[in-house]
Amino acid sequence: MDVTEKVNLVLRPPTEEVVTQEELLELFKTNSKPKHYIGIEISGFLHLGSLISTSFKINDFVKAGVDCTVFLADWHTLLNEKLGGSFETIRKVSKYYDDAFRLVCPKANIVLGTDLYDSKKEYWSELVQIAKHMSLARTMRTLTIMGRSENDEKVDLAKLIYPAMQATDIHSLDLDIVHAGMDQRKIHMLVKDVFPKMKWKVPVAVHHKLLPGLAKPPEEKPSGEVVKMSKSDPNAGIFIHNSDDEIRTKIKKGFCEEGRTENNPILEIAKHIVFHEFDTITIERPEKFGGNVSYDNFESLESDFLQKKLHPTDLKQSVGESLVKIVSPVREKLVLSNELSDLIKNNLVFDRRH
């Protein structure tokens, strides 16, 4: 595979941004096996965004010859008070995440945060070094990576450690490529600003599109801001453990205004999930409504939807069936005990209240 093909794999949707493409091109020219990571907080049930979309992108990196790592950030999860702030619960749920990513990304390395910190005695001294290059104001601005407001005056001291730890993770893993959803952009920009001053390796940053929730987006949200699929709201997205009928029903109820292409979750799923997995989407409909039609690229489907040649009901039916084909094999192989399921459910109630 030549360098251009590798770059195109990285740029493939759901990728939204590469900082920078020139650096990525040069990296592939000089490094036959660059090191990648994506950090994952261990929180609720895995869904279409947190497992499927993320794994599709990881597998693109693998195809491009990249050495990929899924970093299960157990200590970051504790700092962010997920799963009730119980480290015992976090450790139990981390096994579920480990199993899931090994299943969907079989060629990726899985690293638990605790294991990294136990194996690298210099980690904490490096954490202090990078913290000395971070002002309190900039640290506060990066709190959005945790889903927190940068204006939160009641934030506890522990949460302020989170951004510095994430930056130190990147250095400790000796990474060439850092990968995350767009919500992690601020920490990656901090890394690209601070690491050169410390004479540390500066990685390329790759950010993928966050899948939106299925509900109609709030009108007051600024243009381009995404209400992402939530692990704590059972009605907000497609979860790996939803049955086939639940998947179809959720898609059927999802927001998909006729002719509207902006902030349309069903179109986003078609683009970033369905077309990633399948070369063609076939819309089945009666002859009186135009008969069956197939699309071999998202742009033509989007164009027909915009011109109201493709009705939301028909699009939803096709997307729902496609998702069943994608999710059901994962659901059937990913074991989730009743005990662990109840543990996650109970702690999600706690997370929503705090």
Task: Give residue spans per PLM region.
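Short connector loops at secondary-structure junctions
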Residues: L72-G85, H208-L214
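Conserved nucleotide- and phosphate/pyrophosphate-binding catalytic cores
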Residues: A167, R185-H354
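Short glycine- and acidic-rich boundary segments immediately preceding or forming the N-terminal edge
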Residues: M1-V18
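Divalent-metal (Mg2+/Mn2+/Ca2+)-assisted nucleotide/phosphate chemistry catalytic cores
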Residues: F87-H207
